[in-house]
A protein has these predicted regions:
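Flexible helix-coil transition and linker loops at the boundaries of alpha-helical arrays
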Residues: 63-75, 103-111, 141-151, 184-191, ...
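Canonical tetratricopeptide repeat
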Residues: 73-76, 80, 114, 153-157, ...
Length: 286
């Protein structure tokens, strides 16, 4: 799962947290003017994409809070600071912030999922962290019966790590690990999450098992085709429709492949990738 997509999920969770307003209004009412000013400035900078400046503002707000314990408004500031650090690509700093948050609420699955994502990104770049740390955090979140979009994204991030390692080292054991983790995700979601099915379909195509890939594609499309889609769901459907055409092409069923790509073009328009596929297929069908 890519940085922007995960960050949007985190940002949405934070906004919903404040929309509830149960504790936020009380705590904001008791904070200092300097603390409030820096907190609001940090949120504005975060929304503008000025992540480093946002972190500085949140640090000033925490300093103004003046408490030696992690509680109250300071937790909310830390949540925003952690997001800003993550979106800035400062994963080590984000890890520190989420570990602080976990020390205040060790059972909050959101923090575990973000640590799973961060540990995945730090694997192979930090000698003290490896993919097993990410899986441990993911499993802890799963034990909280976590079925959130963020949890799904954490699992996909781990699976994609294994696929990236395969691409770098061409060691099939990485593909085995990716498949094992994706099957775990399919089981957790009861094969009812289109995003997981889309990633699984691409993986099975890489393994040249096009029948299993098509099965996942058909399941994923069936989950989405009759509902009003969010932006994320529409991107997933787009991926599934392209995968359908690719699978039929690899199976040498060129007529079905062309039909699938034409359906893709009808819905999403023509781009360079699909134009190349269509040209190839038309040449073959002749």
């Amino acid at each position: 799962m890519r940085l922007t997509e995960v960050a949007l999920v985190v940002q949405g969770r934070i906004r919903r947290f404040f929309a509830v307003g149960v504790l936020a209004v009380i705590m904001l009412g008791g904070c200092s003017g300097k603390e409030r000013k820096n907190f609001e400035a940090g949120k504005a900078l975060l929304n503008e994409g000025k992540y480093a400046e946002a972190v500085e503002a949140f640090d000033k707000a925490i300093e103004a809070h003046g408490s030696n314990s992690i509680r109250g408004l300071e937790i909310d500031i830390l949540r925003y600071r952690a997001e800003a650090e993550y979106r800035a690509g400062d994963y080590k700093a984000a890890e520190h912030s989420y570990r602080l948050l976990t020390s205040a609420d060790e059972n909050r699955s959101e923090y575990m999922d973000m640590l799973a994502i961060i540990y995945t990104k730090l694997s192979n770049t930090d000698m003290d962290i490896n993919i097993d740390n990410a899986i441990e955090m993911y499993d802890k979140a799963a034990k909280q019966d976590d079925k959130s979009e963020l949890h799904i994204n954490a699992g996909i991030t781990i699976a994609e790590y294994y696929e990236d390692m395969y691409d770098k080292k061409m060691d099939a054991t990485y593909l085995d690990s990716a498949e094992e983790f994706l099957e775990k995700l399919l089981k957790e979601t009861g094969r009812k999450n289109a995003k997981v099915l889309a990633v699984y379909a691409k993986h099975m195509s890489k393994r040249e098992d096009y029948d299993k890939a098509l099965e996942a594609v058909d399941e994923g499309i069936a989950l989405l085709e009759k509902k009003k889609l969010t932006k994320s769901e529409d991107e997933t459907l787009k991926s599934l429709m392209f995968s359908r055409g690719s699978c039929y092409e690899y199976k040498s069923d060129y007529n079905k492949a062309l039909e699938a790509f034409n359906a893709y073009i009808e819905k999403y328009g023509e781009d360079e990738s699909v134009s190349h596929e269509v040209a190839f297929l038309k040449a073959r069908i002749r």
